[in-house]
Amino acid sequence: RYLHYKTDGIYAPGGGKNMAPRQHMRKIKAGKITFSEAYKAVEEYRTKYPDKAVTYYAQNYPAMAWAVLMAGGSCPSIFVHDETFLSDVAKMKVEKTDTDTYKKLVKSDTGAIVYSQSPGEISVFVDDGKYSLKYIDPSSGTVEVLNKSFKISGLYVLKIPEGKEGVYWIHKLK
């Protein structure tokens, strides 16, 4: 229940010491938690309990909201106030990427959300149609339109430029 991943291993409060986990964290060096560790923790629980709500709470948890969302977690504290985005993300499922440089949520008839931590090219498969491409600042939730309308025929290669790592939202237009 109180286990979580850190950069140097797993945090687990000592048993039988009559201390609350927060007290135990003060006594030891708790370590740092990164996007990858938070993602891994939520993904493991989501896989083990697919029909349950999975929440995440650990050291610096508000900063890990995007990791929670991208791993399929419930109720992350992201700051995006776009109703269409929230509607789209609720329909999407996690798509395995086998890399820590980016994570994807996809529903082929709705679009995709890509969280990229480094520049490069990312392939996204969606249904044929017209889409818009938007960039979301992960810390502020500000939505910036990059391409108002373009056509996709199955495969779209998203190019992440240097210095523009973050959240990309590919939204299907009606």
Please give the residue ranges for each predicted region.
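Aromatic- and carboxylate-lined catalytic core of secreted/periplasmic carbohydrate-active enzymes
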Residues: 19-147, 155, 159-174
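Aromatic- and acid-rich polysaccharide-binding/catalytic face
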Residues: 1-26
